[in-house]
């Protein structure tokens, strides 16, 4: 049974009438451009065919009822006329409440709604299940009540909800790609202007995500340290963000910087340049060049930004040995575990899967999870 059928059937059973709309919003993977978002730089994600789906209908009062199919059909109810505060027990409900609350601040011309939510974006894998949920809820209200909001505004609303209501720091990339993703394309995003450019993906190329299943422990504290180091670098150059520093300016005075800060800055500057070039390489179908850029990105994350772990490096090496110069592979996400992303011709999928199955657990003692994805459409009706 599809997620659409599941949520529609549950909606009718739970609420006693049929849903009027079913909305989806996808998860995402970032192909290249790591830790560049909070430096006002560039990222190149694509939406994937794992999504959050919501069957819904407007109500003629001011009540919101939400059922979470993936959490034992837990039900949350709240009123649009009372202050919206955090739910004491259901963490999932706070993503919904946060989106609704922040949407009220933007445009209060919507009424009540009934929703049933289900999703298949793997949680905790760095594939943005939370952003997918936020964008789906925002799109539900926009569609049911014809709110004059575009995808970027729905994305910004989701980011605000996560930062301010849920209390989790995140950049804008995850929500933006979920809202604006385009089938068979990646999206080059300028994280300063929020300008986007759709980049066509070569035909017959698989987007493969492999979860190392290495439990991330350092990610919070180390993430904040990296942000501070980048801000220190920007201050040294008297610029608002590292986006505004050229590699030539950096090379001329790198020796004056603290050696660790210099390494962090070098990663951001070179990663930004790689990301812009990667968009061109993809558009031209040049998988060999894309592979070189992804390899450089991984080496930079490993050696200059120091956010990879041995298990991730091992996974990358296993995949690279199979695909050679026919594609690329690198760590994706915040670091210290999580996933790798690989782009290569579809016909190599079985060989890559076999090599990883035979070697990764033997070398690390951990079993991987393997996802073959398609670049997918952003949020909308399904």
UniProtKB/Swiss-Prot annotation:
Alphabetized HAMAP family for the sequence: Galactokinase (MF_00246)
Gene Ontology MF, one: magnesium ion binding
Protein name: Galactokinase
Binding residue positions for substrate: 34-37, 223
Binding site for ATP: 124-130
Subcellular location(s) per record: Cytoplasm
Gene3D superfamilies according to UniProt: 3.30.230.10, GHMP kinase, C-terminal domain
Domain of life: Bacteria
UniProt-annotated catalytic positions: 174 (proton acceptor)
Role of this protein: Catalyzes the transfer of the gamma-phosphate of ATP to D-galactose to form alpha-D-galactose-1-phosphate (Gal-1-P).
Pathway it works in: Carbohydrate metabolism; galactose metabolism
Matches recorded under InterPro entries: Galactokinase, Galactokinase_bac, Galactokinase_CS, GalKase_N, GHMP_kinase_C_dom, GHMP_kinase_C_sf, GHMP_kinase_N_dom, GHMP_knse_ATP-bd_CS
GO cellular component, one term: cytosol
Organism whose genome encodes this protein: Escherichia coli O6:H1 (strain CFT073 / ATCC 700928 / UPEC)
UniProt record, GO biological process: galactose metabolic process
Residues reported to bind Mg(2+): 130, 162
Primary location class: cytoplasm
Keyword terms of this UniProt record: ATP-binding, Carbohydrate metabolism, Cytoplasm, Galactose metabolism, Kinase, Magnesium, Metal-binding, Nucleotide-binding, Transferase
NCBIfam families referenced in this protein's UniProt entry, alphabetically: gal_kin, PRK05101.1
EC number, as in UniProt: 2.7.1.6
Entry keyword Metal-binding: yes
Family: Belongs to the GHMP kinase family. GalK subfamily.
Recorded catalytic activity of this chain's protein: alpha-D-galactose + ATP = alpha-D-galactose 1-phosphate + ADP + H(+)
Gene name for this UniProt entry: galK
Residues carrying the site annotation Transition state stabilizer: 28
